């Protein structure tokens, strides 16, 4: 059984026992349980239910493993030709690591 769930504006395929890295969830504590009820699709033993826009009564229950995980560094380089202007910026996106405990449909 799996579900397509929307978390922080992104869609994920969720199955029980799976780990997900989603964009940082504000005020999240390690070990806390979070429920997401914006389920767009549920596949239960080959029986597919598509929501319009969401499936009623369906939810995905997750446990927060780590509330703050930093992604790989992305380097942004700006240069203006012939002027000697160079600028290098770095950015590391913050993520939250979740473990899906169950999919309720």
From Swiss-Prot:
One MF term in the entry's GO annotations: rRNA binding
Source taxon at top rank: Bacteria
InterPro entries named in the record: bL21-like, bL21-like_sf, Ribosomal_bL21
Coiled-coil ranges per UniProt: none
GO terms (BP aspect): translation
Keywords: Ribonucleoprotein, Ribosomal protein, RNA-binding, rRNA-binding
A cellular component annotation (GO) from this entry: cytoplasm
Described purpose of this protein according to its UniProt entry: This protein binds to 23S rRNA in the presence of protein L20.
NCBIfam families to which the protein is assigned, alphabetical: L21
Family: Belongs to the bacterial ribosomal protein bL21 family.
PANTHER family according to UniProt: 50S RIBOSOMAL PROTEIN L21 (PTHR21349), LARGE RIBOSOMAL SUBUNIT PROTEIN BL21M (PTHR21349:SF0)
Quaternary structure (record): Part of the 50S ribosomal subunit. Contacts protein L20.
Protein name per the record: Large ribosomal subunit protein bL21
Species annotation: Bacteroides fragilis (strain ATCC 25285 / DSM 2151 / CCUG 4856 / JCM 11019 / LMG 10263 / NCTC 9343 / Onslow / VPI 2553 / EN-2)
Phylogenetic lineage: Bacteria, Pseudomonadati, Bacteroidota, Bacteroidia, Bacteroidales
């Amino acid at each position: 059984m799996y579900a397509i769930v929307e978390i922080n504006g992104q869609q994920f395929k969720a199955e029980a026992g799976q780990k997900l890295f989603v964009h940082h969830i504000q005020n999240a504590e390690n070990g806390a349980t979070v429920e997401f009820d914006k389920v767009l699709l549920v596949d239960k033993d080959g029986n597919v239910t598509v929501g319009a826009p969401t499936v009623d009564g369906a939810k995905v229950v997750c446990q927060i493993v780590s509330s703050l995980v930093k992604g790989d560094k992305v380097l942004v380089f700006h240069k203006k030709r012939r002027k000697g202007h160079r600028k290098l910026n770095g950015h590391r996106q913050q993520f939250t690591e979740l473990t899906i405990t169950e999919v309720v449909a």
